[in-house]
């Protein structure tokens, strides 16, 4: 592609030039997958606690008194590794999830930049929404459904799943493929809004930081701070959808006719506060999650730019 036609990519710059270099979607897929795998290994304990608190419904006597009590009970019963129960199900999904997200975002954003290669905030929002939907349908919904069922099963009195793959086989055998796509509508809404908010905030902050110099290098620390801010914004923006999604994918999903019915039942039986159950552990996890992912993604793309010459 001629230099005059190359749009500016979100993560790479061409020093000394008025326009930034295109980030090839293939690079985005590789960098995104690596970033997703590393991130989930670091942040999984907070995801585990968040899921436990959301499944601890108020309609029954609460099992946990809060975040600290959930951690204490888990460590006392299963040791420190107990906080990593269900990791495999999320790890298998995190790598392709981030790969699809960043690959799609770069593909869309490379076609939506202006003549100077800039991506404005509105287009960043649209590209984020566009990246979140296929991420939800292809990877997130089936993997999150399996993860929630697996964690729920492992914390029951008599666990029936011997491992991740055994759990997948049992879920498919008992419920068919439909059993791995529970809560699809809530998941699409959640992921679409998630990525829309995050990329909107990241694009806005990057544009503000770089000002009139689109090639101004981004320090990893600055990228991490911007990522944490983007993560916090997405948490407060769509935690209710995350709660509904988790309920729709749990072992008691049969109680709800659909996504709307789930939301109405939660509101009627538990009140508005229930929609923000698990917000604190999710906030800590997501801020760290988004910061780590964007840092690793940016650095891997920089490395790939040195060894993979693609127009």
From Swiss-Prot:
Q: Which residues form the propeptide?
A: 1-13
Biased composition (Low complexity) is annotated at 1-15
Q: Where are the transmembrane segments?
A: 29-46, 86-105, 129-143, 183-202, 224-241, 278-297
Gene Ontology biological process terms from the UniProt entry = mitochondrial citrate transmembrane transport
- Solcar repeat segments run 23-111, 122-208, 218-303
Stretches for region Disordered:
1-22
Localization, UniProt: Mitochondrion inner membrane; Mitochondrion membrane
Annotated catalysed reactions: (S)-malate(in) + citrate(out) = (S)-malate(out) + citrate(in); D-threo-isocitrate(in) + citrate(out) = D-threo-isocitrate(out) + citrate(in); citrate(out) + succinate(in) = citrate(in) + succinate(out); phosphoenolpyruvate(in) + citrate(out) = phosphoenolpyruvate(out) + citrate(in)
Provide the Gene Ontology terms for cellular component: mitochondrial inner membrane; mitochondrion
List the GO molecular function terms.
antiporter activity; citrate secondary active transmembrane transporter activity
Q: Which UniProt keywords apply?
A: Antiport, Membrane, Mitochondrion, Mitochondrion inner membrane, Phosphoprotein, Repeat, Transmembrane, Transmembrane helix, Transport
Membrane topology value: Multi-pass membrane protein
Phosphoserine: modified positions: 156
Q: Which family does it belong to?
A: Belongs to the mitochondrial carrier (TC 2.A.29) family.
What functional role does this protein have? Mitochondrial electroneutral antiporter that exports citrate from the mitochondria into the cytosol in exchange for malate. Also able to mediate the exchange of citrate for isocitrate, phosphoenolpyruvate, cis-aconitate and to a lesser extent trans-aconitate, maleate and succinate. In the cytoplasm, citrate plays important roles in fatty acid and sterol synthesis, regulation of glycolysis, protein acetylation, and other physiopathological processes.
Protein name per UniProt: Tricarboxylate transport protein, mitochondrial
């Amino acid at each position: 592609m001629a230099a005059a036609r190359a749009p500016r990519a979100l993560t790479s710059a061409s020093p000394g030039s008025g326009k930034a270099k295109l980030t090839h979607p293939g690079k985005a897929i590789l960098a995104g997958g690596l970033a997703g795998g590393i991130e989930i290994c670091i942040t999984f304990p907070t995801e585990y606690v968040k899921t436990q608190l959301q499944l601890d419904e108020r309609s029954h006597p609460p099992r946990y008194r809060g975040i600290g009590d959930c951690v204490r009970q888990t460590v006392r019963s299963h040791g420190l590794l107990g906080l990593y129960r269900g990791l495999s199900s999320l790890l298998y999904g995190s790598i392709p999830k981030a790969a699809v997200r960043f690959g799609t975002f770069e593909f869309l954003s490379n076609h939506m930049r202006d003549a100077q290669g800039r991506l404005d905030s509105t287009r960043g929002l649209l590209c984020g929404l566009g990246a979140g939907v296929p991420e939800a349908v292809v990877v997130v919904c089936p993997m999150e459904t399996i993860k929630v069922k697996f964690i729920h099963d492992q914390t029951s009195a008599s666990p029936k799943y011997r491992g991740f793959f055994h759990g997948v086989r049992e879920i498919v055998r008992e419920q068919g493929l439909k059993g791995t796509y529970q809560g699809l509508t809530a998941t699409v809404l959640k992921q679409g809004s998630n990525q829309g908010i995050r990329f909107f905030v990241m694009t806005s902050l990057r544009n503000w930081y770089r000002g009139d110099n689109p090639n101004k290098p981004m320090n990893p620390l600055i990228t991490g701070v911007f990522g944490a801010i983007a993560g916090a914004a997405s948490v407060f923006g769509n935690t209710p959808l995350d709660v509904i999604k988790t309920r729709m994918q749990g072992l008691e999903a049969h109680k709800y006719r659909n996504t709307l019915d789930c939301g109405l039942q939660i509101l009627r039986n538990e009140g508005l506060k229930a929609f923000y159950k698990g917000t604190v552990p999710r906030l800590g996890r997501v801020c760290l999650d988004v910061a780590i992912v964007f840092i690793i993604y940016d650095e891997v793309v920089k490395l790939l730019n040195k060894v993979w010459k693609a127009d």
